[in-house]
């Protein structure tokens, strides 16, 4: 079962550093985990990808992230409303509310390097493949927010003796 897919605005390949890097990640913000559990399959330059698209390099597959969803709200009225007014505490690693959208990433070094080398802009498509749900979950709209995909590259310099 598949929910509605998300495709990003084009990202300029010229703005992405892919040469001489040790790792490239695609980061996603505002991923909702209040509903169904799902695998987020990530494809580059394949906005038509769906749950039946083979996850391979030829189809632009970059990797997957996995969300263990809460399955909907089972508490009293107001229980599932996220308190956006709670002050941020840099010494408290917990989310301010269990239903606060999460940030996640996919290690996609080879896929991004391969796609960026073609010189065209890059679109990021996330295909949510539903793996678990309850009657209270909206399985069509598991991706409720703009995911703000960001391509991040890392350079590691290792000194040898």
Predicted regions: what is each one?
Residues 1-161:
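Intrinsically disordered, flexible peripheral segments
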């Amino acid at each position: 079962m598949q929910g509605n897919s998300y495709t990003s605005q084009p990202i300029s390949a010229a703005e992405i550093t892919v040469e001489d890097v040790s790792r490239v990640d695609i980061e996603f913000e505002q991923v909702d985990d209040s509903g169904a559990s799902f695998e987020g399959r990530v494809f580059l330059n394949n906005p038509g990808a769906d749950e039946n698209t083979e996850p391979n390099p030829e189809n632009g597959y970059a990797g997957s992230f996995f969300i263990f969803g809460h399955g909907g709200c089972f508490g009293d009225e107001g229980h599932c409303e996220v308190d956006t007014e709670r002050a941020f505490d840099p010494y408290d690693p917990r989310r301010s509310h269990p239903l606060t959208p999460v940030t996640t990433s996919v290690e996609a070094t080879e896929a991004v390097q391969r796609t960026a080398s073609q010189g065209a802009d890059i679109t990021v498509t996330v295909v949510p493949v539903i793996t678990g749900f309850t009657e209270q979950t909206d399985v069509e709209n598991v991706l409720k927010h703009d995911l703000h995909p960001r391509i991040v590259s890392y350079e590691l310099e290792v000194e040898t003796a």
